[in-house]
Amino acid sequence: MAHESHESKAPAGAGEAEAVEVTVVLPAHNEAERIECAVEETERALSSFCRRYEIIIAEDGSTDNTAEIARKIAEKRKNVRFMHSDERLGRGRALNRAFKKARGEVLAYIDVDLSTDMRHLRELIDAIRVEKYDFATGSRLLKASHTQRSLKREAMSRLYNFLVRLLLRSKLRDHQCGFKAFSRDALFSILDEVEDKHWFWDTELLVKAQWRGFSVKEIPVHWEERSGGTKVKLLKDSISMLSNVLKMWLNERCGERGKGKGF
């Protein structure tokens, strides 16, 4: 059963608690070794340009001691909240659940491995907060991006994103970078249409956002593959995601575009 085990108290009264500028969600499944560092780095980056923020650790059915560590972090840090699920929800469902509990006007999520350089966080948030884009995403595949990862993963990523552009008519270069931000209103207007529960969530969200006419900014980032970092199983998850691209394309061809059906 999924439940929220801990939620840190707001630093002041209810009125101020509602006036959160930015919420950053950290999805965490078996991240005991990295979650504390991820929270520290995220809070350091956020506090340098934002006064009213919160960080939500969306712990997702971990079998190590991620939940215990995350609970202690939330108890010690006033701007950190902790959500726990006894069962594995999948990355997409865990993000959906956390965003629906978030208080920020700008909502974002960052992969806990911090492969994306945190110096880009302000640019990501300001794309929504200042430039008024509806969605913003880091990109490892723009000319100005700097990416370090294996040739196999680079080739698979380029092929995958090419097929998404070709079949689903996306204008973006990179759909899967775990470094995204959203306008609260824009995200909530489309969130229930996104049905994938795991890795394809990002692609489905960004493609449907474009189909709905939302503005999306793609930001070149410095990105470095971390040792033991990714939870993606290259062959299995690649086949699954390519299958989802084909399903989405077939549904769109059958007149289902924008209706959130067929997944």
Residue ranges and their predicted role:
Residues 38, 66, 95, 119-121, ...:
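Acidic donor-diphosphate engagement hotspot in glycosyltransferases and nucleotidyltransferases
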Residues 1-21, 165-170, 193-263:
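Hydrophobic helical membrane-anchoring modules
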Residues 26, 51-62, 83-85:
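Short beta-strand/loop segment that forms part of the nucleotide-sugar
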Residues 79-101, 106, 115-199, 225-243, ...:
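Acceptor/aglycone-binding surface of glycosyltransferases and processive sugar-polymer synthases
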Residues 31-34, 62, 91, 117:
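Donor nucleotide-sugar binding loop of glycosyltransferases
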Residues 1-44, 51:
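N-proximal low-complexity "stem/linker" segments adjacent to membrane-targeting elements
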